[in-house]
């Protein structure tokens, strides 16, 4: 039986740039690195960066990875990333504050204030087309 998400592996073209981005801008802790990769950690998230020199970037779809952030930290975090020239890929149109940004390889990321419970509460007030709740 599955117990949850174990780790996330992202292909990256420039390993040092990606380590710096995740460690220095996003606050991940570097646990280990080797010629072709690195292990980082943020809370209980284990992130593996895997060097793929010919990596062409992620697919152009809505797939993205969202990180939780406290409401009190959100504005400062978004301002810091903007000040470092981090590119945004989407404007927030949903419940809770969200900052949608790209890593150096174009992986779509999000910093989101809230959780599944707050999203479901908002959806109960204004459901998406065809939305049905399990309870």
From Swiss-Prot:
Gene3D superfamilies: 2,3-Dihydroxybiphenyl 1,2-Dioxygenase, domain 1 (3.10.180.10). The active site is at 110 (proton donor/acceptor). One of its GO terms (biological process) is response to antibiotic. It catalyses: RX + glutathione = an S-substituted glutathione + a halide anion + H(+). Residues 4-114 form the VOC domain. Mn(2+) binds at residues 7, 64, 110. Its main location: cytoplasm. GO terms for cellular component: cytoplasm. Homodimer. Metalloglutathione transferase which confers resistance to fosfomycin by catalyzing the addition of glutathione to fosfomycin. PANTHER family: GLYOXALASE DOMAIN-CONTAINING PROTEIN 5 (PTHR21366:SF14), GLYOXALASE FAMILY PROTEIN (PTHR21366). This is Glutathione transferase FosA. It comes from Pseudomonas aeruginosa (strain ATCC 15692 / DSM 22644 / CIP 104116 / JCM 14847 / LMG 12228 / 1C / PRS 101 / PAO1).
